[in-house]
Amino acid sequence: MTGNSIEVRDLTRVFGKFTAVDHVTFDVRRGEIFGFLGANGAGKSTTIRILCGLLGPTSGTATVGGFDIGREPDRVKERIGYMSQKFSLYEDLTVDENISFFGGVYGLSRDRVREKMPWVLEMAGLWGRERSLTRELSVGWKQRLALGCAILHEPEIVFLDEPTGGVDPVSRRNFWELINRLSGGGVTVFVTTHYLDEAEYCNDIRLIHAGRVVAGGSPREMKRTYIRNPILEVECDRVVDAMEMLQKEDWVLETSIFGAYLHVSVGDEAEGKAKVRRLLEANGIAVRRMDRIVPSLEDVFIQRIEQESGDGDLRGTK
């Protein structure tokens, strides 16, 4: 048996004339946090539904927990926990009723659910609220409860589909602490997200665009492999005008808006700084600060998507 929890080979899913997942291949090692990144509609959720046995592939193969998703879907489902984008909780049930319900779904006896109940309540921080209706909980509390319900049966692999969507930054950080605890206990965590800062928490990453994997590796490897030229962060007036001017220059490799700043990729740091300053100031745009920065995964994402798009139609997006 290999050291992989998940093995995917040429996985493809077609809906009519639309290819949602296009010959995707990757491995997920046991006990790691694996991030599947991409914009909305890139194919993340379709992939995760196939791996959970909720949707069949058009072609290709995959094994989850050592079992083939096509031939042995029931064996796969016994070994996984799944948390969907909408958390899949029943709003009109109380906290403990939701836990009991999902325990039954996963085949746990009533006695076993009672044994696990305190653990879920403690993990989710919901002691004293077990009789509260789920609809009365904040989004952050619902998120933690949904995770508790998904891992109630102690699965070896957990699939989390956009688990932090619509959650405030503090709740997001707390949720990732829970994910790290799971991974530290030997659970394999497969998480889809479009929050690129969250990908820094992952051991391994795949970036999917238009159904195809376009980049992969650890966060450090991806920055080193896909970003080879200096990136300058420019603080200036009239950011949009500045970006449009820079995009017309042959010596500018890539440019994107990041909040109130510009990120500009150039071939040479010193020469690039001089040219950026000269161009902008000649057009009446004051440059307040310009520094070379360590590239982020967002830089990788934007650069790879622009390269895949060909015409750079994502320039200026964040």
Features from the language model and the residues they span:
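Hydrophobic anchor residue at the start of the ABC signature
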Residues: 147
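Conserved catalytic motifs of ABC-family nucleotide-binding domains
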Residues: 154
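Catalytic Walker B motif of ABC-type/P-loop ATPase nucleotide-binding domains
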Residues: 158-161
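Conserved ABC ATPase "signature" region
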Residues: 100, 104, 111-129
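Conserved ABC ATPase signature
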Residues: 92, 133-140
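ABC transporter nucleotide-binding domain
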Residues: 177-191, 196-267
